[in-house]
Curated annotation (Swiss-Prot):
<dbReference type="GO" id="GO:0006412">
    <property type="term" value="P:translation"/>
</dbReference>
<keyword id="KW-0699">rRNA-binding</keyword>
<comment type="function">
    <text>This is one of the proteins that bind and probably mediate the attachment of the 5S RNA into the large ribosomal subunit, where it forms part of the central protuberance.</text>
</comment>
<feature type="compositionally biased region" description="Basic residues">
    <location>
        <begin position="9"/>
        <end position="21"/>
    </location>
</feature>
<keyword id="KW-0687">Ribonucleoprotein</keyword>
<feature type="region of interest" description="Disordered">
    <location>
        <begin position="1"/>
        <end position="25"/>
    </location>
</feature>
<dbReference type="Pfam" id="PF00861">
    <property type="entry name" value="Ribosomal_L18p"/>
</dbReference>
<dbReference type="InterPro" id="IPR005484">
    <property type="entry name" value="Ribosomal_uL18_bac/euk"/>
</dbReference>
<dbReference type="GO" id="GO:0022625">
    <property type="term" value="C:cytosolic large ribosomal subunit"/>
</dbReference>
<comment type="similarity">
    <text>Belongs to the universal ribosomal protein uL18 family.</text>
</comment>
<protein>
    <recommendedName>
        <fullName>Large ribosomal subunit protein uL18</fullName>
    </recommendedName>
</protein>
<dbReference type="InterPro" id="IPR004389">
    <property type="entry name" value="Ribosomal_uL18_bac-type"/>
</dbReference>
<keyword id="KW-0694">RNA-binding</keyword>
<dbReference type="GO" id="GO:0008097">
    <property type="term" value="F:5S rRNA binding"/>
</dbReference>
<dbReference type="GO" id="GO:0003735">
    <property type="term" value="F:structural constituent of ribosome"/>
</dbReference>
<keyword id="KW-0689">Ribosomal protein</keyword>
<comment type="subunit">
    <text>Part of the 50S ribosomal subunit; part of the 5S rRNA/L5/L18/L25 subcomplex. Contacts the 5S and 23S rRNAs.</text>
</comment>
Length: 122
């Protein structure tokens, strides 16, 4: 019996989740990718295979305001707030949340809560 690394476990969970999650133009998928040093969020229309809007800790809008580490929960809150504002500006209110195989805890949860508080429904 072989054991899977953490990355392989995350990829396995993500494949399992993606069988049931799909985004449309009216209700796109809010996909979250978490690396060791940054966090990324995209709104994806799976039918058209296009990204409607995105935000990350690498955005110029956030880099100037983030004085601390970009891998913190505070940075995730800022990304969640920014992606929600960009979605609402495009007229998107409802999304399907895709945690990307990560556990719903810590930075992923902080991003989701901030997006909800900014007006996205999921």
């Amino acid at each position: 019996m072989s054991t899977l690394s953490r990355k392989q476990q995350t990829q396995k969970r993500h494949r399992r989740l993606r069988r049931h999650l799909s985004g449309t133009a009216n209700r796109p998928r809010l996909a979250v990718f978490r690396s060791n040093s940054h966090i990324y969020a995209q709104l994806i229309d799976d039918e058209a295979q296009s990204t409607l809007c995105s935000a990350s800790t690498l955005d110029k809008d956030l880099r100037s305001s983030l004085k601390t580490n970009c891998s913190s929960c505070d940075a995730s809150v800022a990304v969640g707030d920014l992606v929600a504002k960009r979605a609402i500006a495009k007229g998107i209110q409802q999304v399907v949340f895709d945690r990307g195989g990560n556990l719903y805890h810590g930075r992923v949860k902080a991003l989701a809560d901030a997006a909800r508080e900014a007006g996205l429904q999921f």
